[in-house]
Structure formats: C-alpha cells, structure tokens
Curated annotation (Swiss-Prot):
Keywords: Cytochrome c-type biogenesis, Disulfide bond, Periplasm, Redox-active center, Signal. Belongs to the thioredoxin family. DsbE subfamily. Residues 1-20 form the signal peptide. Disulfide bonds join C80-C83. GO terms for molecular function: disulfide oxidoreductase activity. This is Thiol:disulfide interchange protein CycY. It comes from Rhizobium leguminosarum bv. viciae. GO terms for cellular component: outer membrane-bounded periplasmic space. SUPFAM superfamilies: Thioredoxin-like.
C-alpha cells in the first residue's frame, strides 16, 4: 500500500498545484475577481496621445477620440490568443451606438494588426500603435487583453483584465456603463 501511495504522490501534488493555480486565476484569496483590478489611473484623466506616436492606416487614437464620449479603450495584439477570443464580443458591443470603442495595439507590427482586423473585423473607431509598450505602461497595463471604460470627461471608470466575455460584460462593463449614462443599458 505504501508503494502505491508513493507512486501517486506526484500526481496528487500536481493536482493540488493545478487546482490552486486555477483558484488564483479566478479570484484572489479575498474572493475578489482579479480580472477587475482597478487601473492605476482609475478616477484620473486618461491620456491617449502616447499611443498615437506611430499610426496604422486607420483613424489614429488621440485624446479627441476619447474625450467627450463614453469610450471603451481595448489593449490588444495580433499575437494574443485571448484577444482573438474576445474579438467577437467587442464586435457585438460596437453595435451599441452609446459606446465609442477604440484600441491600443500593443507591441505588435502594424501589418499584423491590419491583417488581424481584416480577418476578424474591426470594431474600433480609432487605433493607437504602441510598438514598445510605453503607452501601455502609462495606462497601467500589465497583461493583454485589457479594457478600460473611460467617461466623457476622460476619467477611467472601469478596468477589465483579460478577455471580455458576455458574462464579464453583464457583471462589470454594463453596470459601469449604466452608472455613467445614468440609465439602464439594454
């Protein structure tokens, strides 16, 4: 019996580590969803200009593209698999005329980003190119995809770390939009 237990020990240890990693991925030890960590810029003004340094052949992301309207800023890259997963959700969200959706293309080649958008569709009204990640640092990004809901005054109202899903929209982004708009979002 001791021989079999010893043989199963690595499997049991691996299972425990995998389960713990899954729990950490889903939530921290305080029961909070870590995908909704506040941005370092929360409730401060957001500056889009650094991402406009190099532009693709799409409308450029500037401060004017963000301020004055409720805007979702999505940080993505063509090489990011979770970005591909969330793309259909963003395309559907782009149909809501009350929300402006713009992007920061993170550490990517412009040609690759254009191919990505050509293949999957373009939900963005403007795109900033961030080849070295400086704009992402300015925004407080630490992994992509990330999305920021920015109020009409330029204040970050909500941050989503990881791919947006229908569930995350319902539980996080939509309530933040409703609060910003002062009315229910259908």
């Amino acid at each position: 019996m001791g021989r079999y237990t010893l043989a199963l020990l690595p499997l049991i240890v691996f299972g425990g580590i995998a389960h713990g990693a899954k729990m950490l991925y889903d939530q921290d030890f305080h029961g909070k969803n870590i995908a909704e960590i506040p941005s370092a810029l929360s409730h401060q003004g957001a500056d889009a200009e650094p991402a406009a340094a190099r532009r693709a052949t799409l409308p450029a992301l500037t401060d004017a593209a963000i301020k004055g309207k409720l805007t979702l800023v999505n940080v993505f890259a063509s090489w990011c698999l979770p970005c591909r997963d969330e793309h259909p959700v963003l395309k559907e969200l782009a149909k809501d005329g009350r929300l402006n959706i713009v992007a920061i293309n993170y550490k990517d080649q412009s040609d690759n980003a254009l191919r990505f958008l050509g293949e999957l569709g373009n939900p963005y009204q403007a795109i900033g190119i961030d080849p070295n990640g400086k704009a992402a640092i300015d925004w407080g990004v630490y992994g992509i995809p990330e999305s920021y809901l920015v109020g009409a005054d330029g204040t970050i109202l909500y941050k989503r770390v990881g791919p947006s899903t229908n569930i995350s929209l319902k539980e996080g982004l939509v309530p933040a939009m409703e609060k910003a708009l002062g009315k229910p979002v259908s």
